[in-house]
């Protein structure tokens, strides 16, 4: 667990440097060196259930609806499959995400998540297909930890701390999503219900720093709302769980 411990000491140090009264994003998060060595012994090999704000329940499908940048109708399904994939010697759960725009499938993605023994959920990559008129036209955004310099990131901390920022993925120049914890006591109302004690994150891509989303994660449920707050418009809200 030494390497993971070093990773979180770095995060804690970055959080300590943040001004509690400053709501701005970290000035240059890309300036912080990112390096993590993965030891498969630090990760669960079975019974992967996620954590409070990112539960992993095999067989569940979350359905989100909303609007895109140009007002198009968006529908996203997120299915927690019973399939796994070994990446860097770590067992990852495969989660399939399908995005529809005006009822047409535009993206089909398989995400790979793992859980360490401290309860943090890691993101080991994705296989993504862009689709037009039923035909695959690209695989932009695809990456796999351990390949071509890519490293896994944290998709959800077991114990998120306000003001802390962290990398969710890392392939230099290709996949550089990061998140900053804004609150662990937020509220969110969506078609599926109203929730208190939510985690509110600012999430953005270092390659597109002018575009920022706020995401709300309900305890015991996971992501319930994502809304663009800078650079773009659009919102997705949880409407159903199957």
Question: Where are the regions a protein language model picked out?
Answer:
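Conserved functional acidic sites
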Residues: 18-242
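Sec-dependent signal peptide recognition
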Residues: 2-10
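C-terminal motif of bacterial Sec signal peptides marking the signal peptidase cleavage site
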Residues: 13-16
């Amino acid at each position: 667990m030494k390497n993971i411990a070093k990773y979180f000491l770095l995060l804690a140090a970055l959080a300590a440097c943040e001004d509690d009264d400053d709501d701005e994003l970290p000035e240059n998060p890309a300036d912080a060196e990112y390096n993590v060595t993965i030891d498969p012994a630090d990760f669960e090999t079975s019974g992967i259930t996620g954590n409070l704000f990112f539960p992993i329940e095999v067989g569940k499908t979350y359905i989100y609806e909303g609007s895109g940048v140009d007002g198009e109708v968006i529908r996203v399904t997120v299915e927690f499959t019973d399939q796994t994939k070994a990446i860097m010697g770590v067992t990852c759960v495969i989660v399939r995400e399908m995005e529809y725009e005006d009822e047409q499938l535009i993206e089909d993605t398989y995400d790979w998540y793992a859980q360490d023994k401290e309860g943090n959920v890691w993101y080991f990559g994705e296989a993504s297909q862009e689709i037009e008129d039923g035909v695959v036209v690209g695989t932009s955004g695809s990456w796999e930890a351990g390949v071509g310099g890519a490293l896994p990131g944290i998709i959800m901390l077991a114990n998120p701390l306000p003001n802390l920022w962290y990398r969710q993925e890392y392939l230099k120049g290709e996949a550089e999503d990061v998140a900053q914890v804004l609150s662990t006591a937020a509220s969110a109302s969506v078609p599926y219900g109203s929730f208190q004690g939510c985690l509110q994150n600012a999430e953005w891509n270092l390659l597109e720093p002018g575009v920022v989303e706020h995401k709300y994660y309900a305890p015991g449920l996971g992501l319930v709302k994502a809304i663009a707050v800078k650079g773009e418009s659009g919102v997705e809200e949880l409407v159903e769980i199957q």
